[in-house]
């Protein structure tokens, strides 16, 4: 993949190209770990800068050890926030750096480069995914009000009032997480999180327009139409945008890509602010609080069974991978359990000191009564998410 990127650099008369961890929805998780493909780095955060004569991997302090181990000396490791691309480019003549405009925001580019180079958008499709087959296992589904405590209709009304109070005509909801919260929907587009990858617009006439893979809406199309929620393919975004009324458009600078910002700004006056849904969803109602407690009780039962099993097992026959699988089996005993909320960290001895460690065939260690065992894990349940470390 490094050679492919360097070919892209040469074809476009560039001096470098930057690769982020995120996908176009800017969530923590994505189906493809681009950093692992390029640098063999499996951590959950970071980015890569490929120059003609050097390769650079930027990670935070959690991952410096892991990055050095996995990148196999093919990359220079930089620790953020102490080093950014702008710091290694400042002594060069202004270089031409390419980026995918669907994977970066203007705010992120400013932090990384701060006018230290010339930036060029390149629609590369370097990490183009296969066309996903739609089946009953990856369809979008609705969450009952009994679980979330508030109907989507009520949430939309509250959101409308915020826009009206700030004299904003349209709102672009670029975060898939926020779309799921607003419409009380869930999906299976990401590992470890029940998110459906959709974006939406709340229009000046207060209708909701959804953009994404509409084939996944098969089971809820009728309900959406009944509630005046329309839906289109991602490629229809600009066409729909051109038909909207109003003068202003609110976007979240942290999750609206350079690509979408340019499309919106060609037609509307942009107002940047944190997506108001962020505040709305962070204040939990009584039903959500009750269900979160219930999820932690169920998860606590699973972890208690696991700890009892560990205490009464023969350590000589156990290793990190066996521990991880056994803990998962206890969680699966609950009918409301969905899947892990993140990759389980089961680190024996020195492996427990590696932040966000993930055991594999090469690193898997046997348990030892004289060594600490760190287990950091969590579960996604139908009514809550957990994270527990022991």
Regions of interest found by a model, annotated:
Residues 1-92, 104, 108-241, 298, ...:
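N-terminal accessory/capping or targeting/presequence segment of soluble
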Residues 4, 8, 12, 115, ...:
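Generic, well-ordered alpha-helical scaffold segments in large soluble proteins
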Residues 15-19, 317-342:
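Amphipathic alpha-helical
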Residues 24, 103-105, 178, 255-256, ...:
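Short, charged beta-turn/beta-strand-edge "cap" motif at the junction between a beta-strand
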Residues 112-113, 385-390:
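Short, compositionally biased
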Residues 115-134, 256-291:
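Terminal amphipathic helices with adjacent charged low-complexity linkers/tails
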Residues 220-275, 281:
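Conserved catalytic alpha/beta cores of large enzymes that bind or transform nucleotide phosphates
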């Amino acid at each position: 993949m490094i050679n492919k990127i360097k070919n892209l650099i040469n074809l476009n008369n560039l001096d470098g190209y930057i690769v982020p961890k995120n996908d176009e929805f800017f969530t923590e998780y994505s189906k493809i770990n681009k950093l692992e493909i390029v640098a063999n780095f499996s951590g959950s955060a970071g980015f890569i800068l490929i120059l003609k004569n050097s390769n650079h991997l930027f990670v935070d302090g959690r991952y410096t050890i892991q990055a050095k181990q996995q990148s196999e000396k093919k990359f220079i490791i930089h620790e953020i926030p102490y080093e950014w691309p702008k710091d290694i480019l400042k002594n060069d003549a202004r270089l031409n750096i390419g980026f995918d405009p669907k994977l970066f925001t203007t705010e992120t580019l400013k932090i990384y480069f701060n006018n230290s180079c010339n930036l060029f958008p390149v629609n590369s499709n370097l990490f183009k995914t296969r066309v996903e087959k739609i089946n009953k296992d990856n369809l979008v589904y609705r969450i009952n009000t009994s679980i979330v405590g508030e109907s989507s209709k009520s949430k939309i009304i509250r959101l409308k009032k915020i826009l009206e109070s700030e004299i904003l005509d349209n709102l672009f909801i670029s975060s898939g997480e926020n779309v799921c919260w607003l419409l009380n929907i869930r999906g299976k587009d990401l590992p470890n999180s029940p998110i459906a990858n959709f974006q939406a617009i709340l229009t000046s006439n207060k209708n909701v327009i959804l953009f994404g893979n509409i084939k996944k809406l098969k089971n809820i199309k009728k309900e959406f139409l009944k509630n005046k929620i329309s839906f289109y393919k991602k490629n229809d975004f600009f066409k729909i945008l051109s038909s909207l009324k109003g003068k202003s458009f609110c976007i979240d600078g942290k999750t609206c890509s350079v690509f979408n910002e340019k499309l919106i700004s060609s037609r509307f006056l942009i107002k940047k602010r944190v997506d108001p849904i962020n505040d709305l969803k962070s204040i939990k109602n009584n039903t959500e609080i009750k269900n979160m407690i219930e999820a932690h009780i169920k998860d606590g039962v699973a972890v208690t069974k696991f700890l009892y099993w560990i205490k009464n097992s023969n350590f000589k026959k156990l290793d990190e991978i066996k521990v991880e699988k056994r803990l998962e089996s206890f969680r699966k005993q609950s009918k409301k359990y969905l899947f892990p909320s993140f990759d389980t960290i089961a680190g024996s001895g020195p492996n427990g000191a590696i932040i966000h460690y993930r055991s594999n065939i090469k690193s898997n260690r046997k348990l030892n009564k004289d060594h600490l065992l760190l287990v950091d894990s969590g579960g996604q349940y139908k009514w809550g998410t957990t994270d527990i470390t022991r």
